[in-house]
Amino acid sequence: MLAWAAIAGLLPQSIIGPFTGALIDRWNRKRIMMLADTFIALCTLILAILFWIDIAQVWHIFGLLALRSIGSAFHMPAMQASVPLLAPTDQLTRIAGVNQIIASVSQIAGPALGAMLITIWKIEYVLLFDVAGALIAVTSLFFVHIPNPEKEEGVERDILKEMKEGAMIILRNKGLSWIFLYDISVAFFIIPISVLFPLMTLDYFNGTEFQAGIIEAIWSVGALIGGAIMGAKVYKINRVALINWMYLLCGLTFLLTGVLPTDGFVWFAVLTAIGGVSGAVYNAAFTGLLQTKIEPGALGRVFSMFFTFSLIPAMLGLVGIGFLADGLGLTTSFILSGSIIIVIGIAAFLTPPAMRLDRQKD
């Protein structure tokens, strides 16, 4: 059920991603973020009302998750595409690290606060906190000036042509193409395996639901540490090499998790934290790399393409991971996925066009 809920929240975003990217590069990015946040809040408000009048069904939840995904398809690329218009180029990776800190804090505090509030109030009232948060975000954007990239005057604009241009920006750059390919391949294994973490706690380590929740929080704590490392200063390092090292580190944590004994829950928690660190460092390095190497006027399309290309194979993995875990077992699934991610990381180091990308002058 969790896998299908995740698919409901990802499928619309992946389908319309290339279209939204072209629109983001065409429209006012500040307004896009404000409207997207408002739309997402409206979906949550409708769900709260359905619970309040006691008619909420599973299909309502899945449908509204899908609608929220449409809002996210606009919001996330617009936000990432706006950062280079506000910050110096040499600070972009550091800012991406700070964003990882913010995301990690919300991932740690959000579930904990939600679990506490659900014991006090009904779910419809708890959902209103999400609505209130969106209203605060939209209001704060009123006071922020976000410039839009310069557009060529007198040029006929065609959305399909702009989508093709976004794809060609990636394909024409061999280094960027390889990095995208490796990222898509890794996402195919990382995102589905993340669904198995609670099952590892409950079924393999014979843990409790509380311990399963702790593991989810520990990943976010690791991501918080990784974000803090990347946000602390500007590092003079090849970001492509850093991304590849994080592939190896993340794959190793999955592989070692698969060989742990049933009484190795503490080590599972340690490996989960390290995996969280690797994920945050990777995300900060990758985001900063794209923001540095791509013109601001095309970033909406490139980020949308990236999200789409990453999410589609990840969803295929989500569909198949249950069958894989049932057929091979939980630990074998971790060992297999971790080993493949390590192989991808090694292959990435042996790809000269990708390794040269962050050495090239902008």
Language-model regions: role of each:
Residues 53-57, 119-127, 261-264, 327-332:
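Transmembrane helix interruption/hinge and helix-loop junction motifs
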Residues 15-18, 26, 32, 164, ...:
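C-terminal transmembrane bundle of multi-pass solute transporters/carriers
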Residues 147-181:
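Juxtamembrane intracellular "pre-TM" segments in multi-pass secondary transporters
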Residues 54, 81, 85, 127-157, ...:
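Helix-loop junctions on the cytosolic side of multi-pass membrane transporters
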Residues 5-44, 60-119, 129, 134, ...:
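Substrate-agnostic recognition of the 12-TM MFS/MFS-like secondary transporter fold
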Residues 45-49, 112-116, 138, 255-258, ...:
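Alpha-helical transmembrane segments of multipass membrane proteins
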